[in-house]
């Protein structure tokens, strides 16, 4: 029987909560700093700032984009004042098992994230896997337009030079998989089971070779 991903040549990996486990604490640390930034920048009570953070993330795919659209706050100011202040080494460390998994995959590998280039590079270096990826697609490379906007996916397809039918996307956020599936990519939901039957389900990233 042919495996669903047997003709995949390029794999796009989401970054946060995909290349490291959700219980690492890094996401929570970043969320606190984002709420801190919003509270300072908009002169809001912290709880209100945190609720705004969540609403903008749900509505725009990235809080940075929402703050830019609704409040005119440059994304560079947002990242400098929030996520790029996180000491990622407090939450994640070199992961030999992840490195072994990535190194065993014959496909070309890229990171596909809504975070900034600097933050993504720091996370990959902390995990000890930067050299195992051909490149990183980040918020700057998509012109500030985050997943699930269609533009980042178009950028990734053009930059890799591969047909979507030969590409796979792995993401823990189901909303980010829809545009990839529409393009013809193999889409893999990590963590909780997907609602959309187009997406494959993967509980543990280390089981990925069984799908490919």
Which role fits each region the language model picked out?
Residues 1-9, 99, 103, 110, ...:
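Asp-based, Mg2+/Mn2+-dependent phosphohydrolase catalytic module
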Residues 3-13, 18-96, 118:
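N-terminal helical cap/lid subdomain that shapes the substrate entry/recognition surface
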Residues 23, 52-53, 90, 108-109, ...:
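A generic structural signal for short
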Residues 61, 107-110:
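Generic structural signal for secondary-structure transition and capping sites
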Residues 90, 94, 112, 145:
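Residue-level marker of regulatory loop/turn positions in helix-turn-helix DNA-binding domains and
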